[in-house]
Amino acid sequence: MCEIARSRRYIVCMPVVGEYEPSPAEWVRDQVAAYEESNGTRANTLRDTGLPIIIVTTRGNRSGKVRKSPLMRVHHDGAYALVASKGGAPSHPVWYYNLLAHPDEVAIQDGPEPFDVDVREISGEERATWWERAVAAFPPYAEYQVKTDREIPVFVATPK
């Protein structure tokens, strides 16, 4: 379980502990703040799509600070797919590198309470299966893959 300090500058979420640095993107900062303040009852969809999101907490690869990213909710049998699409951009999202650098310091909030997860990048048949689930949950992922030359990475996150 996580506790957020009144100042919102620090978050304690074992094992993710440290100074929280909000995203430089205003819409991300606002969505994360509204989601957390409402225990997941507000700002729980991707903008105006009505499609559900989760908040993923990581440790910054370079800064070492706690970072938070809203990602599409792709859930199956208690596990989550974390799809590093970045809208089909040629490079991976920053949080991808955070997961690679600190895979043991990741939490997900899907509703009122965050929980710690184990994450691993997947490939082969397992990736293909999760990719199908991801596209079913958020069809634009298919367009993103066509748009980029890189294979969009997929991680599986399971509660600890």
Features from the language model and the residues they span:
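Extreme N-terminal tail/first-helix region
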Residues: 2-47
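Residue-level detector of beta-strand face positions
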Residues: 55-57, 107, 156
